Amino acid sequence: KEKYGINEENIQKARKIMTVRYEISRNGYSNIKPVIISKSISYLSANQIKEQSSSFPGTSVVTTPIVTYPYGSLASHILGYVGSISSEEYNANKEKYDINDIIGKTGIQYTLEEYLKGEDGIRQVDMSVDGTITEQHIAEEAEAGHTVTLTIDSNLQKVTEEALKKNIKDIANGSYGQKYNAKAGAAVVMDVKSGEILALASYPDYEPELFISGITQKKLEEYNKGNNYYNRAISGTYAPRFSI
């Protein structure tokens, strides 16, 4: 509390204030380099902050695009997930990224990050002496990243994942005779003429959107225990059996 000059007696409130001030100091806040202190706030909260801007000098509310996964865990190992750029990643790519950027962490979103990432625009901002934004306009428009098209058939991918999950559970339950300790597996569907991958499934999978909206400690431990991030279809080593 002394370090950040906090006089608040309520421990819970003091902790929240310290968290915000720590993030500000860690990210090197300045009038021209904002720090995100809250995401996905309600419309009510956003409007209250805007209407009472004089009470929150140096604070502004902005609308930003978000990454969504409309099909949930489908093709999670192929697509991968995105997350906030780490200090190490930022320091290695300061010329390309901002400390508040979201980048690909795994899968296609990591491998093709340089193609998927667009070009930042330039916004000219006028501020008052207390840091409050008084006027702003776009000096240079941002450019969207490239579109990446995969050979994956989404319907076939869904069927493949469902069949893989069912078969693993059936094997574990002894539906085919003897019970086995089956917990994981992989399946790949390839066009034998072109070599294109039409479906690629790995089980267990995960919900990539949780890494954006906020993953709980319980779910994180569950994923780590099951090694859910591991793409068994391309990284696993298995004795050959048969193919169809």
Please state what every model-predicted region is:
Residues 1-142, 165-186, 192:
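Membrane-proximal periplasmic segments of bacterial cell-envelope enzymes
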Residues 81, 200-202:
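Residue-level detector of high-confidence beta-strand sites
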Residues 140-196, 200, 208-244:
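Active-site loop and adjoining helix of the penicillin-binding protein/serine DD-peptidase-beta-lactamase fold
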Residues 205:
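A motif-centric feature for acidic-aromatic and gly/ser/thr-rich catalytic loops and repeats
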